[in-house]
Structure formats: structure tokens, C-alpha cells
Amino acid sequence: IYTYQNTRLVIEEPEQNLFPESQQALINFIVERINAATCQTGKPSSVVITTHSPYIITAFNVLLKAARAEKIDAEATYKVVPKNAIIPFSDIRAFYITDEGTLSNILDEEVQMIGGMELDHASDIVEDKLSLLNDVMYGQAE
């Protein structure tokens, strides 16, 4: 990554064949390398990641939240997230491709994190079915 003046890295579905903990470690590694390349060259580098994994979104949200926590207590923040893995909210973009094929911005300006509710819709469906099956097994709550 350090050979060029700046880097544009595209990664498709990094979650493939990785457990959730490994997904988070991979995102931290990628962000650390991109930040290091930017620092070393003085030129902005970037990464584009396509994903359908809520774990990847959550990993990015941890790094985004760390940027806010860093302003309150940097030393305590660095014990949780490495300094060179932190992402300022202004440095990230996140989009969802709608059923109509258009891009929808899923950044939540208020909490300064990635929304991603669209990605986790499958979890809602599973939870609804589990709830219905619990009703069958244990009777409906009255």
C-alpha cells in the first residue's frame, strides 16, 4: 500500500468465510493500513467495501464511535480501539442499494454511525417467526 501516492482499495464481501470476531479484526486491520498509507504519503487513501454483513457494519460503527469517545478521553479510548483504527464520521460514506436499484444513504447524522436497518431486516423476520413459534409452544400471552 505504501508504494503509491495514494491507494484506492475495493473489497467485495470481506465477511465471506469469516466468523464475526474475524470480521471485526479484518476491518480494524484494513482501516489501520489505509490510515497508515494516508499518514505516510500525506495523500488521502480510501477503501470501498461491499457487504451484507451486520457484523461488518457494527465493526465500522465501533470505529466511528471511538472517534467521538476519543474527544472525551483519548487514553481510555485507545485501550478499547487502537488509535490508528479510529474513523472520523466525516471520512466515511455508507449506502444501501434499494429494491429500485438506487443508492440510499444509511449514515445516521444524529448518532454519527451507520444505520444499516435495511441489512438487518432478515433478523427481524427470524425474530418474528421465533416469537410465533414460542406462541405455539408456550401459548399466547394474554
Specify the residue positions occupied by each region the protein language model found.
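Conserved helicase/translocase motor-coupling segment
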Residues: 131-142
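Switch/communication elements of ASCE P-loop NTPase nucleotide-binding domains
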Residues: 1-124, 139
